[in-house]
Regions:
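Short histidine/acidic/glycine/proline-rich micro-motifs that form metal-
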Residues: 16, 94, 100-101, 239-244
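Active-site metal-binding motif and surrounding structural segment of the metallo-beta-lactamase
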Residues: 43-93
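Conserved beta-strand hairpin/beta-sheet module of binuclear metal-dependent hydrolase folds
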Residues: 2-52, 153-178, 194
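Divalent metal-coordination and catalytic microenvironments
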Residues: 8, 38, 49, 66, ...
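Metallo-beta-lactamase
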Residues: 92, 97-153, 162-164, 256, ...
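Active-site neighborhood of phospho(di)ester-bond hydrolases with catalytic His/Asp-centered motifs
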Residues: 36-40, 59-67, 97, 173-179, ...
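Active-site-proximal loop/helix segment associated with metal-binding centers of metalloenzymes
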Residues: 18-20, 128-204
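Cap/insert and terminal regions of metallo-dependent hydrolase folds
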Residues: 170, 180-269
Length: 274
């Protein structure tokens, strides 16, 4: 793994049904800690990790937001590779809510070989989280929160990351998951340095993609939310893929109608320096 600063590497930026890009998941890194957040919907996670020079042996922390197929099935592949990786040292810590834990454990118990399951027992530690739990991942301090989804139990998180400036004040990253913001979680997000938010499509394209009928939001909504909550930087993800050619430009423009901070609409494999 190359030497890095505090950064996010977007392994995927698409929604559940994309085929030209990968499902939304990312690597959050400081100079001394790496955490994978979700893993997409299959073994495509292995290709994405390889493309950004992250080895399975580098991954010791994995946060899973929820148990939808496009977030959790790639986790099974990561766990399988940890189990069969001869050079793997230490433990893989997997964090998620009770539904996430049940789904992962059920699948691996049903499909992994006995030899692999024995290695899972040795190398993988499952941490079942409750709403509001605080925990440390290396030099990151995390607090998870229930996003109050009506479709599937899902946790976002607030992360305090070491800052590179002289103030020593931590950088705050808020990851909202892939459904609309709930006011109940304001305290986790307000004033954050960085906010990661889903934008299923442009508001201008709402009649085509039906985001509100699917419990999703738009780039316009994300921009309004970022401005209201006083965050400094906005990262949009979990998008449709039919407008990829102009996605970065158009999503940025729409979010900027209301948000005056910096806006990032990353492509797959793009690195964002925090």
């Amino acid at each position: 793994m190359d030497k890095i600063t505090t950064q996010i590497t977007m392994l995927g930026t698409g929604n559940a049904t994309v085929s030209q890009i990968y499902n939304t998941c990312f690597v959050l890194q400081t100079p001394s800690t790496l955490m994978l957040v979700d893993a997409g919907g299959g073994n495509g996670i292995l290709a994405q990790l390889k493309k950004v020079n992250v080895q399975i042996s580098d991954i010791h922390h994995l946060f899973v937001t929820h148990a939808h197929t496009d977030h959790v099935l790639g986790v099974i592949w990561v766990i399988r590779m940890v189990a069969q990786c001869n050079g793997y040292e230490g433990l893989l810590h997997v964090y998620g809510n009770d539904k996430v834990m049940k789904v992962i454990k059920t699948i691996i118990d049903m499909i992994l070989a006995k030899k692999q399951l024995a290695k899972v027992a040795e190398r993988v530690v499952f941490h079942q989280l409750e709403d509001g739990d605080c925990f440390e991942v290396g030099d990151m301090k995390l607090e998870c929160f229930d996003i109050q989804s009506t479709k599937e139990k899902q946790f976002g998180f607030r992360a305090e990351l070491p800052s590179s400036d002289e103030s020593g004040k931590p950088l705050v990253l808020a990851c909202l998951g892939d459904e609309p913001y709930n006011e109940q979680n304001r305290r986790y997000i307000v004033g954050a340095d960085w906010m990661m938010c889903e934008a299923f499509c442009l508001y201008a394209d709402r009649d085509t993609f039906k985001p509100y009928e699917k419990c999703h939001s738009t780039a316009l909504d994300a921009g309004k939310l970022a401005e209201e909550l006083g965050v400094k930087n906005l990262i949009l993800n979990h998008t449709e893929e039919k407008t990829l050619a102009n996605r970065k430009e158009n999503y940025t423009r729409e979010a900027a109608e209301n948000f005056k901070g910096r806006i990032f609409v990353p492509d797959d494999l793009e690195v964002i320096e925090l």
